[in-house]
Amino acid sequence: SGELERRLESDQKDELLAKVRRISHMANIHFVWQTELNGLGDAVSHGRTFVGSDPFALLLGDTILRQTDSSKPVLQQMTEVHEEKKASVVALEEVDREKVSRYGIAGGTQIQHDILALDQLVEKPLPEEAPSNLAIAARYIFQPEIFEHLSRTPRGKNHEIQLTDAMAAMLSDHEMYGFRFSGRRYD
């Protein structure tokens, strides 16, 4: 971001500044700041004018995913699923059943070794109400239709607009897939 570059420049951290600038030319990265904390769904909705009618990747910056059984990064593998299925894709990780109430949880049918056709998404369910122990893992590739669903999503848990609720609504008229990655999540 421009803010980071200005800070590095003023601190005379030229080598780090050069790396940041090189990275910024590799992809079209856009940061959106919420004026009020109204949930992840609200934050994503602020990106609508930037995204337009294109599919887009959403990476939550407070989480790192490290793939252990492939030389390909998680997002690259998700992109391959998206290109094949022409549908939204979300990263999934197995969590202990007693921890499902901390995450958005997905349910669906396994169609390949690491791919599920999703039919259920629930934000922070009680363990006995969870459709599985597959947690949404901070990486998404969305079709632009998510924005219509976000605009109609009422406030949910903690009186916030929950991305998981909009995704669940999207399942009624769009396919969505889960990519089950093998590795570690650092949150």
Can you annotate each of these PLM segments?
Residues L17-A27, V81, T109-I115, A169-L171:
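Short, conserved catalytic or adaptor-binding loops enriched in Gly and charged residues
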Residues S1-L60, L65-R66:
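Conserved N-terminal catalytic core of the sugar/cofactor nucleotidyltransferase
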Residues E3-S10, N28, G52, E83-K85, ...:
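Terminal amphipathic alpha-helical/low-complexity segments used for targeting or macromolecular assembly
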Residues R66-E148, T153, K157:
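Conserved core of the sugar-phosphate nucleotidyltransferase
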Residues E36-L40, R97-E98, P127-E129, R185-D187:
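A short acidic, often aromatic-flanked loop/helix-cap motif at beta-alpha or helix-coil junctions
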Residues L58, V90-A91, G178:
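Structural beta-sheet core signal
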Residues L37-L40, S71, E160:
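A conditional alpha-helix N-cap/helix-loop micro-motif detector
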